[in-house]
Amino acid sequence: NSYYNNKLGDKEDYCIYTDTDSVFYSAIPLVKKDFPNADLTDDKFMTEKILETAEVVQDYINKSYDLFAKKFLNIDEHRFDIKQECVAKSAFWVTKKRYGQWIINDGGIVCDRLDVKGLDIVRSSFPPAMRKLMTGVLQDILGNVDKDSIDEDILKFKKEMKTSDIQDIALPTGVRKLTKFKDKTPRGA
């Protein structure tokens, strides 16, 4: 955050999300500062500038590890090293280890894909029809689709759900050892 604060001349917190070994920052404030008239919707331009910005920030952080290691850990040599992994066009953060992001560059390789961690849509215990709907809704949200259009899709799904196959809308779980309960007296009997 100190790099951002020094460059932008403020004391704002620009960190979006932290995890055990990851930090997520928006590079948009830095790109806006360096290119005030830039078209921020131009994916190619933004990816290029974000990768350049990430490299500068990465070098800044890695150099600061020398001071950190000496001052706080009293060691001269260390193995701390940070690197930029992906560029996300948009993201949806719920809580720690639960998010979805639309990645347009992964490790320097151009891509265009949804990356989801911890949300129900990636869990095998989530009903298939709901997984399909919620994946579509997440893609639409990250793709900046109009809210009314998303609402229409949800209402259409709700209407179609009444005639859907139970296998698609029920939880995909089973009951083990069903015979174990065959001779049990029902509760309340």
Indicate where each model-derived feature is located.
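DNA-dependent DNA polymerase catalytic subunits
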Residues: 1-20, 27-189
